[in-house]
């Protein structure tokens, strides 16, 4: 019969050839097999596997913010449109929190732009661990972040906003030996059935964020 696929053949080598830990004279190769030749180990990947991994990485780069490694604005808008459609169909609640770092420009000016990047990454990393599977954390731009909370009413969203605010306020941040005190202001917006565009919900939360800043910063407003 005709053999198909990929095979490896040992041509009488001194040290032998091993596939996934087993010595072989001739053996078929399966995707992910580890091939040991002498002191060198190779991982066999099929062309289809490499191509799929390539496309997955390209897609990941398109939806993930490079600095903070959370979702970017593009994916945020796609996700929010889907969730608003679901809320309209099923009459479910949803809230959105938008927040930014208080006096972020002063952090950059006093400690340098690298410290600002460090602060953004640290905050994103801390919050990403608190986000549930059905929720979303995204960098909206600059030092602004958005949290989308499906199946969440206003009271619970405000409580979660307070958890974010308190957690960041006590976050021990230091860069190049300098301690960096950081607080955030947060605005909470609630979806209602009259909203037809995702920009309306974002604008509602953004107005609340403006009030939080106008009232002294380091607080949650709605």
Language-model segments: which ranges?
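Signal-transducing coiled-coil linker helices
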Residues: 10-17, 22-67, 74-86, 135-136, ...
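Conserved metal-coordinating catalytic motifs of nucleotidyl cyclase and c-di-GMP turnover enzymes
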Residues: 68, 97-100, 142, 205
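Short beta-strand->loop micro-motif that forms the acidic, two-metal-ion catalytic signature
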Residues: 105, 120, 126-128, 138, ...
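Conserved nucleotide-binding and Mg2+-coordinating catalytic segments in signaling enzymes
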Residues: 58-78, 99-112, 121
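Catalytic-core segments of nucleotide cyclases and related cyclic-nucleotide turnover enzymes
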Residues: 154-158, 191-221
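Active-site-proximal structural segments of metal-dependent nucleotidyl cyclase/transferase enzymes
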Residues: 79-111, 127, 138
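A short pre-motif secondary-structure segment
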Residues: 136-139, 180
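Active-site-proximal alpha-helical element of nucleotidyl cyclase-like catalytic domains
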Residues: 115-136, 144, 163, 168
């Amino acid at each position: 019969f005709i053999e198909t696929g990929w095979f490896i053949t040992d041509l009488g080598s001194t040290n032998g050839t091993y596939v996934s830990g087993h010595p072989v004279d001739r053996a078929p190769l399966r995707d992910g097999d580890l091939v040991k030749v002498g002191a060198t180990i190779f991982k066999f990947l099929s062309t289809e596997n490499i191509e799929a991994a390539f496309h997955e990485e390209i897609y990941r780069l398109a939806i993930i913010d490079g600095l903070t490694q959370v979702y970017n604005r593009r994916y945020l808008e796609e996700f929010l449109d889907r969730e608003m459609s679901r809320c309209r169909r099923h009459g479910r609640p949803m809230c959105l929190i938008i927040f930014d770092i208080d006096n972020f420009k002063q952090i950059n000016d006093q400690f340098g732009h690298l410290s600002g990047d460090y602060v953004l990454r640290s905050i994103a990393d801390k919050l990403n661990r608190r986000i549930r599977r059905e929720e979303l954390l995204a960098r909206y731009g600059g030092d602004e972040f958005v949290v989308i909370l499906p199946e969440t009413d206003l009271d619970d969203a405000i409580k979660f906003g307070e958890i974010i605010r308190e957690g960041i306020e006590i976050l021990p941040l230091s860069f190049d030996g300098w301690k960096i005190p950081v607080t955030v202001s947060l605005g909470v917006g609630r979806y209602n059935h009259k909203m037809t565009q995702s920009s309306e919900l974002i604008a509602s939360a953004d107005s609340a964020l403006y009030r939080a800043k106008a009232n002294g910063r380091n607080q949650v407003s709605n």
